[in-house]
Amino acid sequence: MSSIKIECVLPENCHCGESPVWEEASGSLLFVDIPGKKFCRWNPLTKAVQRMTMDAPVTSVALRKSGGYVATVGTKFCALNLEDQSVVALATVDKDKKNNRFNDGKVDPAGRYFAGTMAEETAPAVLERHQGSLYALFPDHQVKKYFDQVDISNGLDWSLDHKIFYYIDSLAYSVDAFDYDLQTGQISNRRSIYKLEKEEQIPDGMCIDTEGKLWVACYNGGRVIRLDPETGKRLQTVKLPVDKTTSCCFGGKDYSEMYVTCARDGLDPDSLSRQPEAGGIFKITGLGVKGIPPYSYAG
């Protein structure tokens, strides 16, 4: 196996960087800074960063088949245009919960945009419990609510055969699986496939590789872990020089590089001096596995 190399490729100083997505068409990495209310597109070749500031926390971003992007902003599913900096609301959720916001989101293989909510935090990972729900924005802009009683709706992805939906509610310290019906978007038969170890801390963002194994970013754990969803075993741990790793995706040529986002918020001055790259974008090469291209929202 080739040697693993970890480097901070963009010192962005995100309060809480999240939702990395590779955009093959532009050879760029998309990501957000949730408290910074920013959506960013970074081109590793030219080093150019395009930024777009919102009026509410922007928590996830995804590609859109018809062009531009979709994002979760506050409690709204929105369409974004980076060129003219426009934001168009497509749907709103949790109207009865004024203290809620979206968190992580991702598009399924049929082009539906799944995203979940949570209560606003009073400090990182400190919040009113059981206030969140999981939703999906269908291509016709209708919203389906799947379940509620969620603490921090987080990482999500689908198995390579599209028959299993993987999902993380962070404060359950578990990676869960559901049976998935791609035709209808229905989920059923929830079960836990991996419980995090104490030193792994809080499960956050997640992605899948071409071997069907899951990669989970561990918030406060300073690592990404590779899991076998069939055996429930951890296969690999890759530690980063920052504590608050938040999410991960594959990208670059052939999707052979992993990009990892992280946070600065919640670190005291002493911790920040020890990890000056906190809030940056990290690239991991030499993992010996590849990812799959992200799906695009079909609406």
Curated annotation (Swiss-Prot):
Belongs to the SMP-30/CGR1 family. GO terms for biological process: L-ascorbic acid biosynthetic process. This is Regucalcin. It comes from Oryctolagus cuniculus (Rabbit). Substrate binds at R101, N103, E121. Its cofactor is Zn(2+); Mn(2+); Ca(2+); Mg(2+). One of its GO terms (cellular component) is cytoplasm. Keywords: Ascorbate biosynthesis, Calcium, Cytoplasm, Hydrolase, Metal-binding. The modification N6-succinyllysine is found at K144, K244, K253. The active site is at D204 (proton donor/acceptor).
